[in-house]
């Protein structure tokens, strides 16, 4: 009987990526299969996030529920990973005696040996160190799970915004070598992946080593990935404005695989608040990036992050944010009420904006961006959009579901054979959270056919050294 693993994930896309790697690791380690039911599992893993308010208490509430399962099954192993584990590992162990493993984002690859220690009668294991980017060398080969895949290209952040815990929980910026990334994506493409989303806390700060000891910039990486046969759509997240250089903007001008959509967090439209946040740029510099992007790619749509009610935010500061929103015309946003994160510089500032004022401002901001997004959706009526078909529709399994370049969900009727491929769909209806379309053409009528498979590319460029170690030479 196979052993079962249950993973509960909170937080950003990086955490989702890490959880998928944990599942692959545990499958390779002892054939663990994932289960949605915690009560069925032999190992429970909680991948935590410290961005939101009361993150630590949320962890203890969850562990309290799992403690009851361990009382019924003493052999059950419970592990806590992610950013709260990295920041509060010792506190977790002191308050939750049921926890066996505590590991950070950079040490998840050590899970099998930690579990072996526990099974051998060892005490609870805590490993929240920052061993550079070692984890990528220890993880199993990538496995595709649908036509779209996330690939982490770097870890950590060195910007130290005053409100953010990421540099303290994930460490400084460290980039993966170029060859490792290209090899992983080529392997995914060979398994049917058509869309890749490059991941990093500050993805456009990527500076990866090449095989000849040069440094590959993020703009160069984008072009390398876009050139891989089978990868017809390319995304990345999350970016920082101060790293959004002209060479990246130039890629939008000549690389059609790069989607006409960008998530570029700004947090505030007030120069005074941006300075308090230690963002390193002013509102006009952010707008300059958007202006140059739209010159290079006129149809590009922008989403962003906003923090509402940062300490000292006045009515004029909020008005400046709304002015930026009006000037840029965002398609989407992730907007949140400010809450202090322990250990950050901003936590020492007086939180002098009332909760009622924060809620009112948040509602105003979200309402305005919803209006802007709806306007963009209506502009798509009657247009033909290229959709990557992900699978059956959630609401109607007799229909198919896919996404546009701008990540809008489109439901439409078509043959299931199109799942995993691109189709063209005419948009006929617009709803708040999705679009409806009619099938126009399949991939066999498009100019997307591969002339060379990723396997051919890998075979062409593989070289074994004297020790029999395979290297990928781009």
Curated annotation (Swiss-Prot):
Subcellular location: Cytoplasm
Entry similarity comment: Belongs to the methylthiotransferase family. MiaB subfamily.
Domain annotation Radical SAM core: ranges: 143-375
PROSITE patterns listed in its UniProt record: MTTASE_N, MTTASE_RADICAL, RADICAL_SAM, TRAM
Protein name: tRNA-2-methylthio-N(6)-dimethylallyladenosine synthase
Gene expressing this chain: miaB
HAMAP family for the chain: tRNA_metthiotr_MiaB
Domain TRAM: 378-441
Organism of this sequence: Shewanella sediminis (strain HAW-EB3)
Domain MTTase N-terminal: 3-120
Keyword tRNA processing: yes
Subunit note: Monomer.
Coiled coil ranges: none
Positions of [4Fe-4S] cluster 1 binding: 12, 49, 83
Catalysed conversion reaction: N(6)-dimethylallyladenosine(37) in tRNA + (sulfur carrier)-SH + AH2 + 2 S-adenosyl-L-methionine = 2-methylsulfanyl-N(6)-dimethylallyladenosine(37) in tRNA + (sulfur carrier)-H + 5'-deoxyadenosine + L-methionine + A + S-adenosyl-L-homocysteine + 2 H(+)
Enzymatic class: transferase
CC cofactor note: Binds 2 [4Fe-4S] clusters. One cluster is coordinated with 3 cysteines and an exchangeable S-adenosyl-L-methionine.
Pfam families named among the record's database cross-references: Radical_SAM, TRAM, UPF0004
Keywords: 4Fe-4S, Cytoplasm, Iron, Iron-sulfur, Metal-binding, S-adenosyl-L-methionine, Transferase, tRNA processing
The keyword Mitochondrion belongs to this UniProt entry's keyword annotation: no
E.C. no: 2.8.4.3
One GO term describing the cellular component: cytosol
Amino acids binding [4Fe-4S] cluster 2: 157, 161, 164
PANTHER family, A to Z: CDK5 REGULATORY SUBUNIT-ASSOCIATED PROTEIN 1 (PTHR43020), MITOCHONDRIAL TRNA METHYLTHIOTRANSFERASE CDK5RAP1 (PTHR43020:SF2)
GO molecular function annotation: 4 iron, 4 sulfur cluster binding; metal ion binding; N6-isopentenyladenosine methylthiotransferase activity
Reported function: Catalyzes the methylthiolation of N6-(dimethylallyl)adenosine (i(6)A), leading to the formation of 2-methylthio-N6-(dimethylallyl)adenosine (ms(2)i(6)A) at position 37 in tRNAs that read codons beginning with uridine.
Names of required cofactors: [4Fe-4S] cluster
